[in-house]
Amino acid sequence: MTEEKAEEKNKMASVFLPALGGVAVCGGTHGNELSGVYLVQEMERQRKERGDGVWPIPVTTVLSNPRAVKECRRYIDTDMNRCFSKAVLSTPITDSSPYEVRRAQELNNLLGVKGSDDVMDMICDLHNTTSNMGLTLIHYSASDWVTLHICKYLQTKITKVPVRVLVLDFPINDAYNLESVSKHGFTLEVGPQPQGVVRADIYVIMKEAVDLTIDWIHKFNSGTVFEGGDVEVFKFIKSVDYPRDPETRNLTAAVHPQLQDRDFCLLKRGDPLFLSFSGETVTCEEEEPLHPFFINEGAYYEKGIAFHLAKKWTLTVPSVQVQTTNSA
Amino acid sequence: MSSRTNISCLQEAKRVAIFGGTHGNEMSGIVLANMWIQNATEIERKGLVCKPFITNPRAVEKCTRYIDTDLNRAFTPENLSASELEALPYEVQRAKEINQMFGPKGGSDAYDVIFDLHNTTSNMGSTLILESSTDLFNLQMVHYIKKAMAPHTCSVLLNEHPQLKYSTTRSVAKHPVGLEVGPQPQGVLRSNVFESMRTILKHALDFIELFNNGVEFPPCTVNVFRVQERMDYPRDTNGNITAMVHPHLQDCDWEPLNRGDPMFLTFDGRTILYEGANTVYPTFINEAAYYEKQQAFVTTCREILAANAIRKAFK
């Protein structure tokens, strides 16, 4: 095929998508995940200093859970990042409603309303994890070309840490995370970082990822064609809990030193998972090789999760470009 | 010339305690103490009783550092002598109870040795914390532990600073020893950190058993880091931090910090340098619990402490 014909072929294969209206950058959805808290504060300071023109597209900054941020806790009453399903968003608010349910509905009004035509195009929800996950982009759908292209872009541009894409594959109304309020929203998860700590290296990665996301949206809206191709993603399959005492439910083992910090490695049958306090190794019994992630996340002990397991998938995304009146 | 005349004869250490959960989200000590409360076989030694104990059970239950106030700052003379039990913050009540069970602080009936188990988000490795440069028993014990742990490094932090020293839970004992192992996030149990702490305690109890059995320990020296100064984060007029520990300093506990070295990085990318006249050795770099105590790190200086030979005093 000649170069001209190939170019024409690509142009014809492009998917035309509407321009994106802007992005909401949300930090402090969990009040002790500090990169996002400080990044949002820094962005608000920049806006005060230099005006809205500091970014080439409209940017809204949100401190999602201000009470939890003030107390440097994950949440006050309940995990806010589980409050955005259609069911919880439509729960009537009473005096005894958990703070986060109330606040989730406020955010839904501000950034949504989820499911309507009026929603924000993009939410970037900023999170940290105690797990060694580098930069992980989390999205609830496996077929959103805009989000997948942004992920692809971040993967090419960010080289300091591994950049991986995790898809949860929920129908949107069941998706319970903050970013599901928007059309193309995703979570920016950076680790490892302890709760209540801001590490400069982690902050810098998160800032770079937000800047590149804004950059992509601006380029896309300005007519850049983003070439299609393959995107490797990890799809959530199941969770695994710690070994526990049947009566007290106390832990009887810790994540094995050979698994600790090896997020997204390939885990095969027989590989060590846990080292018990009495010195025994608990090994993997899964039939098929899977990839563990969120290994030893501090907030997941109370959820009964030592790590999640994922399958690797290759998705193919088409070339995309912005819809203009000519190409509509 | 033998050093026979320079042997210090000390009282045997019959009553030993291991405290976990002084901070309810520092998991290694909590798991170890609970494990040994269930089954004390591992910590049994001839010639001594060793009591494992959870010092702040309500904080442990909520997996939080403290309920009302930091227990590890609560053992002040004012607190310990306070009355009106019901009106006191939870941790002050607890301090009084612990002082009654394991003290009284400064009294002849107090426990001989208390090991207080802590974790830190700082990259301090295995650290033993001492409150006195003249406690021969403790100096000989940490010397023994360091030798036994080698080639794994055990650093020794000495906090004898009149203003920066604080009233710790372990201070009710005659010989208080802090164990600080990191890095480990709050609320997380890392296997390697857990096992290091467990091994340190094994060697510590071995030492006490040998000592109580009449073994003489020859004179020794101990390399320590002596606490000098607390360094806070740069803050704005509202008290909010405006910079983070610089990537060049992050995780470099115990390494020299020289004049002109990067110290902080502002959120908008500017580097702030260390301007002190002398080389210092920072530690507790970026400990999560110290943001509210206005501490980004502490500076230390290196010192060599000498300890006489010791052996158990004959009755």
UniProtKB/Swiss-Prot annotation, chain A:
InterPro entries tied to this protein: AspA/AstE_fam, Aspartoacylase, AstE_AspA_cat, Aste_AspA_hybrid_dom
CDD domains reported in the protein's UniProt record: M14_ASPA
Annotated cofactor note: Binds 1 zinc ion per subunit.
EC number: 3.5.1.114
Cofactor(s) for this UniProt protein: Zn(2+)
Residues annotated as binding Zn(2+): 30, 33, 127
Name of the protein described by the UniProt record: N-acyl-aromatic-L-amino acid amidohydrolase (carboxylate-forming) A
Assembly and oligomerization: Homotetramer.
Upper classification of the organism: Eukaryota, Metazoa, Chordata, Craniata, Vertebrata
Source organism superkingdom: Eukaryota
MF (Gene Ontology): aminoacylase activity; hydrolase activity, acting on ester bonds; metal ion binding
Annotated keywords: Cell membrane, Cytoplasm, Hydrolase, Membrane, Metal-binding, Zinc
Membrane topology of the entry: Peripheral membrane protein
Alphabetical list of Pfam families matching this protein: AstE_AspA_cat, AstE_AspA_hybrid
Protein residues bound to substrate: 74, 81-82, 189, 300
Function: Plays an important role in deacetylating mercapturic acids in kidney proximal tubules.
GO CC entries: apical plasma membrane; cytosol
Family per similarity comment: Belongs to the AspA/AstE family. Aspartoacylase subfamily.
Catalytic activity entry: an N-acyl-aromatic L-alpha-amino acid + H2O = an aromatic L-alpha-amino acid + a carboxylate; an N-acetyl-L-cysteine-S-conjugate + H2O = an S-substituted L-cysteine + acetate
Gene name for this UniProt entry: acy3.1
From Swiss-Prot, chain B:
Binding-site residues, Zn(2+): 23, 26, 118
UniProt catalytic activity: an N-acyl-L-aspartate + H2O = a carboxylate + L-aspartate
CDD domains, per the entry: M14_ASPA
Pfam families: AstE_AspA_cat (PF24827), AstE_AspA_hybrid (PF04952)
Location of the protein in the cell: Cytoplasm; Nucleus
Entry keyword Hydrolase: yes
Record-level Gene Ontology MF annotations: aspartoacylase activity; hydrolase activity, acting on carbon-nitrogen (but not peptide) bonds, in linear amides; hydrolase activity, acting on ester bonds; metal ion binding
Gene3D superfamilies: 2.20.25.160, Zn peptidases
Top EC category: hydrolase
Ribosomal protein as UniProt keyword: no
Cofactor(s) listed in the protein's UniProt record: Zn(2+)
Annotated catalytic residues: 180
Annotated binding of substrate, by residue: 65, 72-73, 166-170, 180, 290
Family membership: Belongs to the AspA/AstE family. Aspartoacylase subfamily.
Function: Catalyzes the deacetylation of N-acetylaspartic acid (NAA) to produce acetate and L-aspartate.
Record protein name field: Aspartoacylase
Gene: aspa
